[in-house]
Amino acid sequence: MSVDSVYKYIVFDVIRNIKSNIKNDSDTENVDESIIDEIQTMWLDRLTQTGAISNQNDPDETTATTTTTQPQSTLSTVEHENVRNTLNSLIQLNNKSQTTTTTTTSTFGNPQQYLPPQKEVSNGTSPTMNSSNGSNNNNNNNNSNNSSNSSNNNNLPSSLRSIMNPMPQNDGTLDESDNDDDNNNNNNDNDNENNKDNIDKLIIDGFKKNFNFNGDEVIPQNDGLNDDDDLDDEEIGGGGGKVEEDSLGSDLDDDDDDDPDPIIEHFVLCQYEKVSRIKNKRKCNFKDGIMHLNGKDTLFNKANGEMIWN
């Protein structure tokens, strides 16, 4: 029984069961069977598009459609057995493919020390022969792996190949390119030092131009060699002598101590409660004070007074 017949049998069996359930169920009794037939044709068309079955109009289909209208008890047991045998054969083929892949990949690429120990041969051959055979097999495997890796590396870009397969250096640790790099680095260091020396020299020259050796700043004169200030400083005093200047703290800076202090004839020293102003007049309410009037001192608790503010 072919794979096409298995797929078609499954489709027709499902559709037959759906129709039987619709007939037996009161809720779905009014469902039209043409809808179920459309579902069947759509299913078969999808299988045909995917390539699971060869052609929908197969002569086996006509026989299968006739059997779909019949009840399940009228199907032959031989057809069931053929379908079951086909499914079992497919399962066995799948299991065999899985076991073969696992057995081949389990020992692939393992070193010799991880391989299972080999039994001695009963005909008296030495185990060294077996070990040599095993080493030869490992060498063959390694050669095959290297050839496969080299073929894979050829498909990679040149940058990746240079990283994965670096070129060994057989002419010694140092070569001319290394010496050239060292010389270039030394020349760069010397240039940097020369630049620093030139910068320091320029800074020192500028400092000497603007400052004298005592550290005083030299202010450049931009208004000519001779001006009025220079003449005043040099020619005051007749014959160009220096003008005597008064030192700080001399008598000229002191105030005249000979002037007498002003005499105050009348004064009041007290606290005030209120001061009101009317034009240039002041009305004051004093308390708790002392007043000096006409050469007499008088204490008071409260006092009122009027003054004219000039």
From Swiss-Prot:
One of its GO terms (cellular component) is transcription factor TFIIA complex. TFIIA is a heterodimer of the large subunit 1 and a small subunit gamma. The lineage of its organism: Eukaryota, Amoebozoa, Evosea, Eumycetozoa, Dictyostelia. Keywords: Nucleus, Transcription, Transcription regulation. It comes from Dictyostelium discoideum (Social amoeba). It is found in: Nucleus. Residues 173-183, 225-236, 246-261 have a biased composition (Acidic residues). The keyword Nucleotidyltransferase does not apply. CDD domains: TFIIA_alpha_beta_like. Belongs to the TFIIA subunit 1 family. Residues 52-78, 91-197, 218-261 are annotated as: Disordered. One of its GO terms (biological process) is transcription initiation at RNA polymerase II promoter. This is Transcription initiation factor IIA subunit 1. The keyword Phosphoprotein does not apply. Residues 62-77, 122-160 have a biased composition (Low complexity). InterPro entries: TFIIA_asu/bsu, TFIIA_b-brl. TFIIA is a component of the transcription machinery of RNA polymerase II and plays an important role in transcriptional activation. TFIIA in a complex with tbp mediates transcriptional activity.
